[in-house]
Amino acid sequence: MSPEEIKSRVGSGLLSFPVTHFTSDYKLNLESYRRHVEWLSGFEAAALFAAGGTGEFFSLSPNEVGQVTRAAKDVSGEVPIIAGCGYGTSLAVETAKIVEEAGADGILLLPHYLTEAPQEGIYAHVKAVCDSTGLGVILYNRANSVANADTVARLAEACPNLIGFKDGTGKVDLVRHVTAKLGDRLCYIGGMPTHELFAEGFNGVGVTTYSSAVFNFVPELAQRFYRAMRAGDRAVMEGILHTFFFPFAALRDRKAGYPVSIIKAGVELAGFAPGPVRPPLVDLTGEEREILQGLIEASRR
């Protein structure tokens, strides 16, 4: 899939990022992962992110990222697979090459590891990854890697295969500056944790799609909310926010790392076997799983 084709697909609807499935001893469980991705592919996702943040990219080796990407491609059918990529420049370039060989349709470039960096450093890092691959690349602005609008514009001019900008900062002024400066040169994706809580505001500044974590286990609900957002149906949105997303977010916020752990718990409650999260994350308690089960059941009424 060409960079322009993946750009068009990404901007056409709701996105999600399957959790990575592990065995009880933390090894990849690709058979279980394939079953889950195949199921998700039947719910009209515009694209799926393999080994993204919720897919525990930070705990995977480059070779494991390649294995996960290939497994997703095996079963996703017409749904494009965008692979996670990140860490320092040399590791990011290595991972980009691995996932391209594994059949990825695009790359989500997650933040570089740990250290802060000036704009010139972020520019050099992103450009090196873009130059290393023929795949379309989406820049994920969050945490310690936040490119300003001028840097994004320079990258868009220098890198024809930079096709998207995903925001995880929640800084609407920065996002608006980027969208005003770049226009339709890029596609724009909302990437806040439980982005449904931010979707209406981001939609107002031209970010019309986002990646939904809960799509992992309640895809019909995620699509219903997304369609209501696009249609401007605030009554439907408000209802879903109050019955599901607000209490879900309260449960998610109980511990650091739970934005990933709670999704894995939801996937298990949906009938799959995603296994535990890898350390240093921890799984939900039994009581918390019961609360989540209640929210899922209430969302279906």
Curated annotation (Swiss-Prot):
Which superkingdom is the protein from? Bacteria
InterPro entries in the record, alphabetically? Aldolase_TIM, DapA-like, Dehydro-deoxyglucarate_dehyd
Which positions make up the signal peptide? Answer: none
List S-S links within the chain.
none
Catalysed conversion reaction:
5-dehydro-4-deoxy-D-glucarate + H(+) = 2,5-dioxopentanoate + CO2 + H2O
The family line of this record is: Belongs to the DapA family.
What EC number(s) is this enzyme filed under?
4.2.1.41
Kindly list the organism's lineage.
Bacteria, Pseudomonadati, Pseudomonadota, Alphaproteobacteria, Hyphomicrobiales
Query: What's the protein here called?
Result: Probable 5-dehydro-4-deoxyglucarate dehydratase
Example GO biological process:
D-glucarate catabolic process
